[in-house]
């Protein structure tokens, strides 16, 4: 019985130590989430402005009806997928949901590796696709908690360049969209060709008047890739925010479960201790009775 009590007590101590770790990780993730949410809000200011400028420009008389490879759909021979996952675990179902969605989509829409290419951001996704011998064109690991454009700009520019060079004919970004600290949703958004401009968006505000220098095509050739890159970067910031929220929720769940186990073990320990004391009393009384 004494051995059993020691084992239970050791388990309680071990789980308490684990709960302290998960509790600390929860607080760290909460802090990262707060910073990521602010970064996402700050980026939206830039994103909304460049979208407004691009929308006004495309619907102005100077460029209305113009053709550009970034805007024009072409026959799809090969599709590109930017898939955003985390580099580490302990984020609940954050990675599994997006990876399952991408895997199902590729199996449904493509018959061979020649029909798609994956651009993986995050080590978990890279390892997942490589283990299944899927076509990973290139990857980026070790993303910062609040990734700057400088860190991801190269891979984003490379993805847009592959589209411009017709290495694939459409580009999707697959990621977890952050809704709030408790929920997220899988999104697969078509980034290229750019086709999400609504003519009605320009209603309600005065259109910007443009004077184009040096010429229309040069302006579009520079502006449209920059706009596409901003969309992709926005998805990365959004995905990172969802990752921190998932990590916080997972660690909170782990801490709550640890507390429940500690409570159950404490009850078990008290019952075992009470049984041991009762047994000792019974033995003492029995021994005293034998001496009479």
From Swiss-Prot:
GO terms for cellular component: plasma membrane; proton-transporting ATP synthase complex. It holds the Pfam family ATP-synt. GO terms for biological process: proton motive force-driven plasma membrane ATP synthesis. Keywords: ATP synthesis, Cell membrane, CF(1), Hydrogen ion transport, Ion transport, Membrane, Transport. The keyword DNA damage does not apply. Its main location: membrane. It comes from the Bacteria. The keyword Cell membrane applies. InterPro entries: ATP_synth_F1_ATPase_gsu, ATP_synth_F1_gsu, ATP_synth_F1_gsu_CS. GO terms for molecular function: ATP binding; proton-transporting ATP synthase activity, rotational mechanism. It is found in: Cell membrane. It is a peripheral membrane protein. NCBIfam families: ATPsyn_F1gamma (TIGR01146), PRK05621.2-1 (NF004147). F-type ATPases have 2 components, CF(1) - the catalytic core - and CF(0) - the membrane proton channel. CF(1) has five subunits: alpha(3), beta(3), gamma(1), delta(1), epsilon(1). CF(0) has three main subunits: a, b and c. Produces ATP from ADP in the presence of a proton gradient across the membrane. The gamma chain is believed to be important in regulating ATPase activity and the flow of protons through the CF(0) complex. PANTHER family: ATP SYNTHASE GAMMA CHAIN, ATP SYNTHASE SUBUNIT GAMMA, MITOCHONDRIAL. Belongs to the ATPase gamma chain family. This is ATP synthase gamma chain. The lineage of its organism: Bacteria, Bacillati, Bacillota, Bacilli, Lactobacillales.
């Amino acid at each position: 019985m004494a051995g059993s009590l020691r084992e239970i007590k050791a388990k309680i101590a071990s789980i308490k130590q684990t709960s302290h770790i998960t509790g600390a990780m929860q607080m760290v993730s909460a802090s990262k989430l707060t910073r990521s949410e602010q970064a996402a809000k700050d980026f939206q200011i830039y994103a909304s402005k460049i979208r407004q400028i691009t929308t006004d420009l495309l619907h102005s008389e100077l460029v209305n009806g113009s053709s550009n490879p970034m805007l024009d759909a072409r026959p799809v021979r090969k599709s590109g997928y930017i898939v955003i996952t985390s580099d580490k675990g302990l984020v609940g179902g954050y990675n599994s949901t997006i990876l399952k969605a991408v895997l199902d989509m590729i199996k449904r829409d493509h018959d061979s590796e020649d029909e798609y290419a994956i651009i993986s951001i995050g080590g978990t996704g890279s390892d997942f696709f490589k283990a299944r011998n899927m076509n990973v064109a290139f990857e980026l690991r070790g993303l910062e908690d609040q990734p700057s454009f400088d860190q991801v700009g190269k891979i984003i520019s490379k993805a847009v360049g592959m589209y411009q060079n017709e290495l694939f004919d459409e580009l999707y970004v697959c990621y977890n969209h952050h809704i709030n600290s408790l929920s997220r949703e899988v999104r697969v958004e078509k980034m290229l060709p750019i086709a999400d401009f609504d003519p009605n968006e320009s209603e309600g505000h005065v259109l910007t008047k443009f004077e184009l220098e040096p010429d229309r095509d040069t302006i579009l050739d520079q502006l449209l890739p920059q706009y596409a890159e901003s969309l992709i970067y926005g998805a990365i910031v959004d995905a990172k925010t969802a990752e921190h929220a998932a990590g916080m929720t997972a660690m909170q769940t782990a801490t709550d479960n640890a507390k429940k186990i500690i409570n159950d073990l404490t009850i078990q320990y008290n019952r075992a201790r009470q049984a041991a004391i009762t047994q000792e009393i019974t033995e003492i009384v029995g021994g005293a009775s034998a001496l009479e």
